[in-house]
Amino acid sequence: MNLNSIPAFDDNYIWVLNDEAGRCLIVDPGDAEPVLNAITANNWQPEAIFLTHHHHDHVGGVKELVEKFPQIVVYGPQETQDKGTTQVVKDGETAFVLGHEFSVIATPGHTLGHICYFSKPYLFCGDTLFSGGCGRLFEGTASQMYQSLNKLSALPDDTLVCCAHEYTLSNMKFALSILPHDLSINDYYRKVKELRAKNQITLPVILKNERQINVFLRTEDIDLINVINEETLLQQPEERFAWLRSKKDRF
Protein backbone atom coordinates (compact mmCIF):
# COMPACT_ATOMS: atom_id res chain seq x y z
CA MET A 1 0.00 0.00 0.00
CA ASN A 2 1.05 3.60 -0.61
CA LEU A 3 0.59 6.32 2.00
CA ASN A 4 -0.30 9.81 0.80
CA SER A 5 -0.87 13.07 2.68
CA ILE A 6 -3.19 15.77 1.38
CA PRO A 7 -2.87 19.22 2.99
CA ALA A 8 -6.14 20.91 3.95
CA PHE A 9 -7.07 24.19 5.66
CA ASP A 10 -4.17 25.80 7.53
CA ASP A 11 -2.51 22.74 9.04
CA ASN A 12 -4.65 19.62 8.54
CA TYR A 13 -3.54 16.47 6.77
CA ILE A 14 -6.01 14.12 5.13
CA TRP A 15 -4.34 10.72 4.83
CA VAL A 16 -5.00 8.40 1.90
CA LEU A 17 -3.89 4.79 1.54
CA ASN A 18 -4.06 3.27 -1.92
CA ASP A 19 -3.29 -0.20 -3.25
CA GLU A 20 -1.78 -1.23 -6.58
CA ALA A 21 -5.23 -1.49 -8.13
CA GLY A 22 -5.92 2.17 -7.31
CA ARG A 23 -8.49 1.50 -4.59
CA CYS A 24 -8.13 3.94 -1.75
CA LEU A 25 -9.00 4.65 1.87
CA ILE A 26 -9.48 8.27 2.97
CA VAL A 27 -8.94 9.32 6.59
CA ASP A 28 -10.68 12.34 8.16
CA PRO A 29 -11.61 14.29 5.01
CA GLY A 30 -12.41 17.69 6.50
CA ASP A 31 -12.54 19.20 3.02
CA ALA A 32 -13.69 17.38 -0.12
CA GLU A 33 -12.02 19.57 -2.76
CA PRO A 34 -8.35 18.61 -2.25
CA VAL A 35 -9.37 14.95 -1.95
CA LEU A 36 -11.35 15.05 -5.19
CA ASN A 37 -8.40 16.70 -6.93
CA ALA A 38 -6.07 13.94 -5.71
CA ILE A 39 -8.55 11.23 -6.72
CA THR A 40 -8.70 12.64 -10.24
CA ALA A 41 -4.94 13.15 -10.52
CA ASN A 42 -4.13 9.62 -9.35
CA ASN A 43 -7.13 7.82 -10.85
CA TRP A 44 -8.06 6.38 -7.45
CA GLN A 45 -11.28 4.51 -6.70
CA PRO A 46 -12.43 5.38 -3.16
CA GLU A 47 -13.52 2.35 -1.16
CA ALA A 48 -13.84 3.68 2.38
CA ILE A 49 -13.54 6.64 4.71
CA PHE A 50 -12.27 6.45 8.30
CA LEU A 51 -13.45 9.12 10.75
CA THR A 52 -11.69 9.48 14.10
CA HIS A 53 -14.01 12.03 15.73
CA HIS A 54 -16.79 14.51 15.04
CA HIS A 55 -14.95 17.84 14.65
CA HIS A 56 -15.78 19.65 11.42
CA ASP A 57 -12.20 19.86 10.14
CA HIS A 58 -12.21 16.04 10.08
CA VAL A 59 -15.69 15.32 8.71
CA GLY A 60 -16.65 18.36 6.62
CA GLY A 61 -15.95 16.73 3.25
CA VAL A 62 -17.77 13.44 3.85
CA LYS A 63 -21.13 14.40 2.38
CA GLU A 64 -19.68 15.64 -0.92
CA LEU A 65 -17.39 12.63 -1.28
CA VAL A 66 -20.24 10.18 -0.68
CA GLU A 67 -22.45 12.03 -3.16
CA LYS A 68 -19.69 11.67 -5.75
CA PHE A 69 -18.84 8.08 -4.83
CA PRO A 70 -21.95 6.47 -3.29
CA GLN A 71 -20.23 3.10 -2.92
CA ILE A 72 -17.96 4.45 -0.16
CA VAL A 73 -18.37 2.87 3.28
CA VAL A 74 -17.87 5.47 6.02
CA TYR A 75 -16.51 4.07 9.29
CA GLY A 76 -16.58 6.15 12.44
CA PRO A 77 -17.36 6.27 16.16
CA GLN A 78 -20.86 6.74 17.54
CA GLU A 79 -20.31 10.50 17.78
CA THR A 80 -20.00 10.74 13.97
CA GLN A 81 -23.33 9.09 13.17
CA ASP A 82 -24.81 12.42 12.10
CA LYS A 83 -21.68 13.30 10.09
CA GLY A 84 -22.15 10.67 7.41
CA THR A 85 -20.94 7.49 9.11
CA THR A 86 -22.60 4.38 7.69
CA GLN A 87 -20.69 1.81 9.77
CA VAL A 88 -20.28 2.64 13.46
CA VAL A 89 -17.21 0.97 14.99
CA LYS A 90 -16.00 0.81 18.56
CA ASP A 91 -13.01 -0.30 20.61
CA GLY A 92 -11.80 -3.81 19.85
CA GLU A 93 -13.65 -4.10 16.55
CA THR A 94 -12.02 -4.28 13.13
CA ALA A 95 -12.63 -2.67 9.77
CA PHE A 96 -11.63 -4.73 6.72
CA VAL A 97 -10.54 -2.31 3.99
CA LEU A 98 -8.23 -2.71 0.97
CA GLY A 99 -7.66 -6.31 1.98
CA HIS A 100 -6.30 -5.32 5.39
CA GLU A 101 -7.72 -5.49 8.90
CA PHE A 102 -7.69 -2.24 10.83
CA SER A 103 -8.07 -2.47 14.60
CA VAL A 104 -10.24 0.17 16.24
CA ILE A 105 -8.78 1.69 19.41
CA ALA A 106 -10.88 3.89 21.69
CA THR A 107 -8.88 7.00 22.62
CA PRO A 108 -11.12 9.39 24.58
CA GLY A 109 -9.65 12.71 25.61
CA HIS A 110 -9.78 15.18 22.74
CA THR A 111 -13.41 14.13 22.35
CA LEU A 112 -15.21 11.49 24.38
CA GLY A 113 -15.82 9.20 21.42
CA HIS A 114 -12.47 9.61 19.64
CA ILE A 115 -11.08 6.45 18.04
CA CYS A 116 -7.90 5.52 16.17
CA TYR A 117 -7.29 2.91 13.47
CA PHE A 118 -4.26 0.62 13.32
CA SER A 119 -3.08 -1.85 10.71
CA LYS A 120 0.65 -2.46 10.95
CA PRO A 121 2.51 -0.25 10.35
CA TYR A 122 -0.12 2.49 9.91
CA LEU A 123 -1.69 4.33 12.85
CA PHE A 124 -4.32 6.94 12.01
CA CYS A 125 -4.59 8.77 15.30
CA GLY A 126 -6.64 11.87 14.47
CA ASP A 127 -6.20 14.48 17.18
CA THR A 128 -5.07 12.15 19.98
CA LEU A 129 -1.34 11.98 19.31
CA PHE A 130 0.71 14.61 17.50
CA SER A 131 4.43 14.54 16.87
CA GLY A 132 5.85 16.11 19.99
CA GLY A 133 2.41 16.61 21.52
CA CYS A 134 -1.15 15.48 22.03
CA GLY A 135 -4.65 16.81 21.47
CA ARG A 136 -6.36 19.39 23.63
CA LEU A 137 -8.94 18.14 26.09
CA PHE A 138 -12.14 19.54 24.62
CA GLU A 139 -14.45 16.90 26.10
CA GLY A 140 -12.43 14.29 27.98
CA THR A 141 -10.24 14.38 31.07
CA ALA A 142 -6.49 14.34 31.49
CA SER A 143 -6.83 10.85 32.94
CA GLN A 144 -8.63 9.62 29.83
CA MET A 145 -6.05 11.15 27.49
CA TYR A 146 -3.19 9.71 29.52
CA GLN A 147 -4.68 6.22 29.21
CA SER A 148 -5.33 6.75 25.50
CA LEU A 149 -1.73 7.78 24.85
CA ASN A 150 -0.50 4.76 26.79
CA LYS A 151 -2.48 2.51 24.44
CA LEU A 152 -0.89 4.11 21.39
CA SER A 153 2.60 4.17 22.87
CA ALA A 154 2.36 0.40 23.42
CA LEU A 155 2.02 -0.29 19.68
CA PRO A 156 5.03 -1.75 17.80
CA ASP A 157 8.22 0.32 17.50
CA ASP A 158 7.97 0.58 13.72
CA THR A 159 4.44 2.01 13.76
CA LEU A 160 4.00 4.95 11.38
CA VAL A 161 2.14 7.63 13.31
CA CYS A 162 -0.13 9.52 10.90
CA CYS A 163 -1.24 12.62 12.81
CA ALA A 164 -3.95 14.91 11.51
CA HIS A 165 -2.21 18.26 12.02
CA GLU A 166 1.14 19.90 11.30
CA TYR A 167 1.79 21.00 14.87
CA THR A 168 5.27 19.51 15.20
CA LEU A 169 7.34 22.69 15.30
CA SER A 170 5.24 24.40 17.97
CA ASN A 171 5.13 21.16 19.96
CA MET A 172 8.91 20.89 19.90
CA LYS A 173 9.28 24.49 21.06
CA PHE A 174 7.16 23.51 24.05
CA ALA A 175 9.24 20.37 24.63
CA LEU A 176 12.39 22.50 24.67
CA SER A 177 10.82 24.81 27.24
CA ILE A 178 10.41 21.78 29.51
CA LEU A 179 13.63 19.86 28.76
CA PRO A 180 16.00 22.41 27.17
CA HIS A 181 19.10 20.20 27.44
CA ASP A 182 17.61 16.96 26.12
CA LEU A 183 19.73 15.81 23.16
CA SER A 184 16.95 13.93 21.35
CA ILE A 185 14.56 16.86 21.64
CA ASN A 186 17.19 19.35 20.45
CA ASP A 187 18.17 17.18 17.48
CA TYR A 188 14.56 16.65 16.43
CA TYR A 189 13.72 20.34 16.86
CA ARG A 190 16.54 21.28 14.47
CA LYS A 191 15.35 18.71 11.93
CA VAL A 192 11.74 19.88 12.14
CA LYS A 193 12.74 23.54 11.92
CA GLU A 194 14.63 22.82 8.68
CA LEU A 195 11.72 20.89 7.19
CA ARG A 196 9.18 23.59 8.00
CA ALA A 197 11.48 26.32 6.65
CA LYS A 198 11.17 24.49 3.31
CA ASN A 199 7.41 24.05 3.86
CA GLN A 200 7.89 20.28 4.01
CA ILE A 201 5.75 17.84 5.98
CA THR A 202 7.16 16.43 9.24
CA LEU A 203 4.88 13.38 9.20
CA PRO A 204 4.44 10.46 9.51
CA VAL A 205 6.77 9.71 12.40
CA ILE A 206 8.08 6.38 13.67
CA LEU A 207 6.67 5.54 17.09
CA LYS A 208 10.03 4.39 18.49
CA ASN A 209 11.44 7.86 17.79
CA GLU A 210 8.29 9.62 18.97
CA ARG A 211 8.60 8.05 22.41
CA GLN A 212 11.99 9.76 22.79
CA ILE A 213 10.98 13.30 21.86
CA ASN A 214 7.36 13.57 23.00
CA VAL A 215 7.23 14.76 26.61
CA PHE A 216 3.63 13.55 26.92
CA LEU A 217 4.89 9.99 26.39
CA ARG A 218 7.72 10.43 28.92
CA THR A 219 5.80 10.92 32.17
CA GLU A 220 7.92 8.25 33.89
CA ASP A 221 11.21 9.70 32.62
CA ILE A 222 13.49 10.77 35.47
CA ASP A 223 14.60 13.98 33.74
CA LEU A 224 11.01 15.09 33.32
CA ILE A 225 10.12 14.07 36.87
CA ASN A 226 13.00 16.19 38.20
CA VAL A 227 11.81 19.23 36.24
CA ILE A 228 8.25 18.87 37.52
CA ASN A 229 9.47 18.30 41.09
CA GLU A 230 11.13 21.71 41.03
CA GLU A 231 7.65 23.21 40.85
CA THR A 232 5.40 20.62 42.50
CA LEU A 233 5.66 17.08 43.85
CA LEU A 234 3.49 14.75 41.80
CA GLN A 235 3.67 11.04 42.56
CA GLN A 236 1.67 9.58 39.68
CA PRO A 237 2.54 9.72 35.95
CA GLU A 238 -1.10 10.58 35.29
CA GLU A 239 -0.72 13.70 37.44
CA ARG A 240 2.47 14.63 35.63
CA PHE A 241 0.64 14.31 32.32
CA ALA A 242 -2.09 16.67 33.57
CA TRP A 243 0.61 19.14 34.65
CA LEU A 244 2.18 19.03 31.18
CA ARG A 245 -1.15 19.40 29.40
CA SER A 246 -2.02 22.42 31.54
CA LYS A 247 1.38 23.97 30.77
CA LYS A 248 0.92 23.37 27.05
CA ASP A 249 -2.53 24.97 27.11
CA ARG A 250 -0.92 28.17 28.38
CA PHE A 251 2.23 27.98 26.25
UniProtKB/Swiss-Prot annotation:
A molecular function GO annotation: metal ion binding
Pathway connected to this protein: Secondary metabolite metabolism; methylglyoxal degradation; (R)-lactate from methylglyoxal: step 2/2
EC number, as in UniProt: 3.1.2.6
Hydrolase in keyword set: yes
Highest taxon in the source lineage: Bacteria
Protein biosynthesis is among the record's keywords: no
Stored HAMAP family: Glyoxalase_2 (MF_01374)
Family statement drawn from the similarity comment of this UniProt entry: Belongs to the metallo-beta-lactamase superfamily. Glyoxalase II family.
The name this protein goes by in its record: Hydroxyacylglutathione hydrolase
Organism annotation: Escherichia coli (strain 55989 / EAEC)
